[in-house]
Design a protein with these regions (language model features):
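Flexible "cap/lid" loop of the alpha/beta hydrolase fold
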Residues: 20-24, 30-62
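Conserved serine/cysteine hydrolase catalytic core
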Residues: 89-143
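Catalytic histidine-centered segment of alpha/beta-hydrolase-like enzymes
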Residues: 147-160
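Conserved acidic catalytic loop of the alpha/beta-hydrolase fold
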Residues: 1-7
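Gly/Ala-rich beta-loop-alpha elbow adjacent to hydrolase catalytic centers
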Residues: 11, 15, 19
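Short beta-strand immediately N-terminal to the catalytic nucleophile in serine-hydrolase-like folds
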Residues: 9-11, 36
Length: 168
């Protein structure tokens, strides 16, 4: 035990789901939970995590390698850079978790926490039903202008500004 208290927990995309799970293990130590476009619901066909989850134990390393090459060819260089920094095992396992229908969904876990919670959108990913749904569950919604899902790449200064607003 590191004896940490008043931790500010941040997560993006699939990392948001990890942050939701971690918060469930130690909510009493968490001061606030800040998420940027996390996975709240199981990934569906057409999402990258769904595609990666379709790989098998036998071929996921070579398939992820092929996906990186495809993305690096100009299709999505940011995603290629991200995947290059992941262990293939981690990419495969979190993607498989992202498609599962959970006994307690990440969305329900996020709604249940009693700490301040924030959900940050990039304005280029809107509209979203969650823009109206999340505040009904006492979640503060913030928007980063001139950014989509990859807001830390697309507008890092804007993201910093919005995160600072969440810390006030």
């Amino acid at each position: 035990d590191l004896n940490l208290n008043k931790v500010i927990l941040f997560g993006h995309s699939l990392g948001g789901a990890i942050s939701i799970e971690l918060c469930g293990l130690c909510e009493e130590k968490i001061d606030r939970l800040i998420l940027t476009e996390p996975n709240l619901d199981p990934a569906t066909k057409g999402r990258t995590s769904w595609t990666v989850a379709q790989y098998t134990e036998e071929n996921y390393k070579s398939r992820i390698s092929s996906l990186i090459e495809y993305c690096a060819s100009g299709k999505n260089t940011m995603w290629a850079a991200t995947l290059r920094n992941w262990l293939p095992e981690a990419a495969y396992q979190i993607s498989r978790d992202a498609i599962e229908v959970r006994e307690v969904p990440w969305r329900d876990m996020f709604y249940s926490y009693k700490i301040p919670r924030f959900f940050i959108f990039g304005n280029k990913t809107l509209p979203s039903d969650d823009l109206e749904e999340l505040p009904k569950n006492n979640i503060k919604v913030k928007i980063v202008e001139n950014a989509g899902h990859s807001m830390a790449w697309e507008n890092p200064e804007g993201l910093v500004q919005v995160i600072c607003e969440c810390l006030k």
